């Protein structure tokens, strides 16, 4: 099952998380009523549904603070009980919430967490903390909702670390240069690419494998990966060039 991504409306995009398919702004008037919109979760099983829209914006506060209830059941949209950010149907783990994910907080690389680079991480320590983080955030061993790993610091494919993520390429080059100062720049860059992609792949594969072992009924996946980067395509298919990058 793929994760559905969308926006409720452009002007609300900073308030609502872009992981989920949300109803268009034209439906807003119908969605707001005085009825209690909290789902009866047993009415909406996830299994055996080819397409599912799930809401994980923490809009339960709208009812508590403003007496505005957002009714989503009319549109067959699943929501966590009391419309919480994490719950029965969807749980999201961000950079600092799952294990020891390494990343930089700025494109200059002046501030890093857990070494900043997948090449520098202690994988055993990461997996140990990750196990504890999952058990704490998803205490139910039979959890069968979406479990989204939202790691957005870097992308595991070298070519996709462009713009503000270029720091992961440049730091990878520096790591190889420190070990092999006599190498040509061409050889350094090629080795940097190999080392980065190898360690990034091991990091991500080991992480999701462990997650599936701990909560095997959960629908685990990464936010934003793989990505077709095909916003200009009209046939809803990944181009051959993009497909090759992810193989």
Model-derived regions: residue spans:
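Glycan-processing catalytic domains of CAZymes
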Residues: 2-247
